[in-house]
């Protein structure tokens, strides 16, 4: 697609500070690949809701109605649709019954890294619209407890709808401030997902000016302050030895590696490796930082995937401590 829309034209459409940041962080060849990804029209992707259906039945059904698809090598319950868009899929009976969930492949990664098990208590701290919440519940085979928190009231209603349509009865939806959850539920959860609000650089597309129009360096700086508050809350809500997955759909270092370094400096946590082999994934950068930061992965935007960043923390054994370095 970048052969039709040239690299120079793509760069000229995007915020200059964003472009400059990319060249500071990546090699020119990788930056060009990111621009090509931003210029791609992404294929429709989905996962089967294993609480109601199974991948073999779904593939059989798609073959019967002549929907062409491709398997996802790193996740058996996901498909890439080759000849139908989201509106086409939404018309299908299996969509309306909640048998499938339209979801980007990148956003399937954090729940898989979290690896929730039957009977566990799980927190999704910033949960709307519910793709990851419902995925977590399905991975648990509908056995256990998931608290899904969302601050925005309208988004919270969308979250409730998706939870209900997917048949995820183990999910409790609450409309609260994420930074307060740690105080309300101290050391309550076995695992916590913090898929934090971010600047969304991994979702930029030249076909939607709104995807990048409001981006600014100030927005990134403001978001990092909120991300730190949310991380503190996530940490405090997590049991000792528990797993905390921190993820964003953005590309910059400030909201990703620098948050990881700050967390390692201020909390009793360590980073764990991510054992998912994704072709579009790169190790996070750790130059001048804790060497373990390269255990996190950055997914570059492409035809199949949005840009994403995923990391996995393990909490140490001692009790929660008050962290004041939130600047």
For the regions a language model picked out, list residue spans one by one.
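S-adenosylmethionine
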Residues: 1-327
